A protein has these predicted regions:
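Beta-hairpin "wing" of winged helix-turn-helix
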Residues: 50-60, 67
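Pre-recognition alpha-helix immediately N-terminal to the DNA-recognition helix
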Residues: 15-17
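Residues within the alpha-helical elements of helix-turn-helix
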Residues: 20, 34
Length: 88
């Protein structure tokens, strides 16, 4: 799963989306408003984040709401910290 996490994090737009979601859940429309890219591009970014299990979705009426999942980021952080300890 770490490979998917790293792939998702390599894009600055996806990192910015994660920063937004760190402050709280957002609808796809609220996320899209923040960026000057096409709706299909935003949808693709959100799909990659979901595939990497960095976000989860739920329906609220006609809206899809995205929420940050911190566990994959915590796992990556732990791995990086352990890697640094081993190399020092």
């Amino acid at each position: 799963m770490m490979q998917e996490t790293l792939f998702a994090l390599c894009d600055p737009t996806r990192r910015e989306i994660l920063k937004m979601l760190k402050k709280g859940s957002k609808t796809a429309g609220e996320i899209a408003e923040r960026f000057d890219i096409s709706p299909p591009a935003i949808s693709r970014h959100l799909s990659i984040l979901k595939d990497a299990e960095l976000v989860e979705t739920r329906r609220e009426g006609k809206f899809v709401v995205y929420e940050l999942i911190c566990e994959p980021l915590d796992e990556l952080d732990d791995w990086l910290r352990n890697m640094m300890k081993e190399n020092l």
